[in-house]
């Protein structure tokens, strides 16, 4: 058959997309395709796109146009492929194939068909696939860290979100399958496992008839991985049983990523999250009572249609009162296929940006205070990078998740991919600074 073409992957978007990219890389490598990180040397470039909000789509389009101008043969995968399949094929003649979010497992066959002269459109109308531990995977994270997808898709219908349209309804993996993959990752030397799905606290509902996150955490407690971190924990799913499992399972970090989106019941109702307005405060207090050292991250949307000054003031007061460790704020992005796109009283972009900036300014001294409280402490740090010019190491403590939170800059001797004790000497709004304890 001759030499197989060389493939590169350009990964855009979230951790779910990253796992899809890693499975495609694993499948291609297993099938004998050379994989190169350098897009210039590749015969084909797979662009795994994001379509969550307008800015993500713009980044995806820029990447596609740059590759097209470089005369690269492009395979478009991911959420934008699922979202705009026909438009992309008509607008981008360099696209030799387009692959949906539920079809990335067919990437080898897609390339074979392209090599035979076809222009391929491989997109399921409703994604139903989820990869398990038997599907090859080539990790692209630092050596000590891995994401582990426990479920795919979402059964909620938040009025601003197109994810169910792009990723399908929730389908969970079995506890046994997840534990087997966790064990594989432990055998590879992974020190930190990050559990992800669209709504991690709903894990198992479709498969077992009730959420099973507590049981999953207890099972993962038997796996030899020092840190297990939970992302995308919805507040209503943080039952006493789940909170107890977090508290009692030694390798589960007391770190919770809570995408609250807003605090005011009126806005939450318009977001089609009416249940949340009644429980935000009580659940946050319950977490802090049960796990006093819990680290809480959250995200908010400002400028949702109909958000008045009163609604916004409620959110500002909420942020001040709860003193979250980490806060992300996004301006509302109107998505055409969602109910929120057609809602009255859309907020001007300038006002949305002012509201976002104000909350971030309010959060900065809170974050600084939280970080300064670590000065003098000896904390475990997972070492991920080394600065070859200074010899300084860079890592994260348990209170920092990858990419979204801060870093720890470390003086002293260390090895990449290991967790070591570090004495914190200084802090700023985002990061910590310390030295290795021998």
Curated annotation (Swiss-Prot):
Q: Where in the cell is it found?
A: Cytoplasm
Write down the required cofactor(s).
[4Fe-4S] cluster
Q: Recorded E.C. number(s)? A: 2.8.4.4
The Radical SAM core domain sits at 140-369
Query: Could you tell me what reaction this enzyme catalyses?
Result: L-aspartate(89)-[ribosomal protein uS12]-hydrogen + (sulfur carrier)-SH + AH2 + 2 S-adenosyl-L-methionine = 3-methylsulfanyl-L-aspartate(89)-[ribosomal protein uS12]-hydrogen + (sulfur carrier)-H + 5'-deoxyadenosine + L-methionine + A + S-adenosyl-L-homocysteine + 2 H(+)
Residues involved in [4Fe-4S] cluster 1 binding: 14, 50, 79
Query: Which GO MF term does the entry hold, naming one?
Result: aspartic acid methylthiotransferase activity
A single GO BP: tRNA modification
Q: List the disulfide bonds.
A: none
Highest taxon of source:
Bacteria
Can you list the GO cellular component terms from the UniProt entry?
Answer: cytosol
Instruction: Tell me which residues make up the TRAM domain.
Output: 372-438
Coiled coil feature spans = none
User: What are the UniProt keywords, alphabetically?
Assistant: 4Fe-4S, Cytoplasm, Iron, Iron-sulfur, Metal-binding, S-adenosyl-L-methionine, Transferase
SUPFAM superfamilies, per database record: Radical SAM enzymes
Q: What does this protein do?
A: Catalyzes the methylthiolation of an aspartic acid residue of ribosomal protein uS12.
Q: Record's family?
A: Belongs to the methylthiotransferase family. RimO subfamily.
Xref: HAMAP family: MTTase_RimO
Instruction: Kindly give the PANTHER family that the UniProt entry links to this protein.
Output: RIBOSOMAL PROTEIN S12 METHYLTHIOTRANSFERASE RIMO, RIBOSOMAL PROTEIN US12 METHYLTHIOTRANSFERASE RIMO
Indicate what this protein is called per its UniProt record: Ribosomal protein uS12 methylthiotransferase RimO
Please tell me the species this chain comes from: Gloeothece citriformis (strain PCC 7424) (Cyanothece sp. (strain PCC 7424))
Gene name as annotated: rimO
